[in-house]
């Protein structure tokens, strides 16, 4: 292998902010932030969703912004659907 062309592989702490859980995973991601866990300093990255919080993996439904879009659509055009059903 050629020297000095591969990224540094190290243990990184990923913080799932939606459930406030920390994961120590090997990664090559670059970050300037650090965190100390169990007396050891690790590079630190925040994430919004992980396998522990994603609805597909948890089986739990979460409210999403698109539900507001559906409600807004129904409010605007729902009267046309009701008129067609009535006759």
Swiss-Prot record:
Alphabetized Pfam families for the sequence: Ribosomal_L31
Superkingdom of this protein's organism: Bacteria
Keywords noted in UniProt: Ribonucleoprotein, Ribosomal protein
InterPro entries, per database record: Ribosomal_bL28/bL31-like_sf, Ribosomal_bL31, Ribosomal_bL31_B, Ribosomal_bL31_sf
UniProt KW Ribosomal protein keyword: yes
Any single biological process term in GO: translation
Molecular function terms from GO: structural constituent of ribosome
GO cellular component: ribonucleoprotein complex; ribosome
Assembly and oligomerization: Part of the 50S ribosomal subunit.
Family: Belongs to the bacterial ribosomal protein bL31 family. Type B subfamily.
HAMAP family for the chain: Ribosomal_bL31_2
Protein's name according to its UniProt entry: Large ribosomal subunit protein bL31B-2/bL31B-3
Organism, scientific name: Escherichia coli O157:H7
């Amino acid at each position: 292998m050629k020297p000095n062309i591969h990224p540094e592989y190290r243990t990184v702490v990923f913080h799932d902010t939606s459930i406030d859980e920390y994961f120590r995973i090997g990664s090559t991601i670059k970050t300037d932030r650090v965190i100390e866990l169990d007396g050891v300093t690790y590079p630190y990255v925040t994430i919004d969703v992980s396998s522990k919080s994603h609805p597909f993996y948890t089986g739990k439904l979460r409210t999403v912004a698109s539900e507001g879009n559906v409600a807004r659509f129904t409010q605007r055009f729902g009267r046309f659907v009701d008129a067609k059903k009535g006759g």
